[in-house]
């Protein structure tokens, strides 16, 4: 059996480089040589233990783009019916459908009752902090369009599918929408991008990082607010002055910080919508007044675990917008598999917009 490298989380806050087996794909699956593995804020929560107990040891990375090395028996197309062959570039959704549960077949919702998110590091594995990913039968993957830039798609990793999932949950962005995005990391930047591409009237991005706020403007934000230079009251006043009496018709929480939640409720205007995307790994509570929700007639939706269709939509959208917006520029640094811990530390510190693991390094 042949072996390859992988960044393995062996216990909480401990990541090592291992030599792991390269498995042949199972019938219906695919073996992929990883080209880019996105480093996500969720990975930081996983390593720290905030995301809950994990079945150590696990190969990290749930954002992956790679080239097909070998197809399992019976595989001739991707999950959209597009023919595939060895060497084609693909992008995969990181949870395999079971097709045998209430969530899958009745609700058509994710996560599924029998969802498998991690596997033991020495077993066939789809983690993207590795030289190879072995995609099981049922794990949706899609062939990149010939003109697609892998970096443009990897830059938005699971953030763009998450945003598309969120807008599915709270309703699409319209031409008359006034949007506030809390946080300008990858999820927030993806929220700005989709809102701008959908024709939103006005988009305000809020963040502490001048670099991230500049990137938000390049992706379509019409105004930015520095979190470091303003109080919550000042931010609310700026939003009211910009949007008028109506206020924000849509607020997107993409900050991953608990205090963002009550502030987002305050920023949401009458009959507005508030979608929570970034608080997946933030454990705790925040006080809000239920009366505010009633008086404003507002809606709140949470969203996580995008469906396979959201990964497909994200791939198509990134390919369509890659020449209009500087998507590939979101990738601010590349790391080798051996440097995975360093990449995670820098993401935790907020020092990078979007790092990736590059297995060629």
From Swiss-Prot:
Zn(2+) 2 binds at residues 98, 101, 104. Pathway: Terpene metabolism; (R)-camphor degradation. InterPro entries: ADH-like_C, ADH-like_N, ADH_Zn_CS, GroES-like_sf, NAD(P)-bd_dom_sf, PKS_ER, Zn_alcohol_dh. It catalyses: (1R,4R,5R)-5-hydroxycamphor + NAD(+) = (1R,4R)-bornane-2,5-dione + NADH + H(+). Its cofactor is Zn(2+). GO terms for molecular function: 5-exo-hydroxycamphor dehydrogenase activity; zinc ion binding. It is an enzyme of class 1 (oxidoreductase). Binds 2 Zn(2+) ions per subunit. GO terms for biological process: (+)-camphor catabolic process. Keywords: Metal-binding, NAD, Oxidoreductase, Zinc. Its EC number is 1.1.1.327. Induction: By camphor. Zn(2+) 1 binds at residues 40, 62, 170. The keyword Ion transport does not apply. CDD domains: MDR_TM0436_like. SMART domains: PKS_ER (SM00829). Gene3D superfamilies: Medium-chain alcohol dehydrogenases, catalytic domain (3.90.180.10), NAD(P)-binding Rossmann-like Domain (3.40.50.720). It comes from the Bacteria. Belongs to the zinc-containing alcohol dehydrogenase family. This is 5-exo-hydroxycamphor dehydrogenase. The lineage of its organism: Bacteria, Pseudomonadati, Pseudomonadota, Gammaproteobacteria, Pseudomonadales.
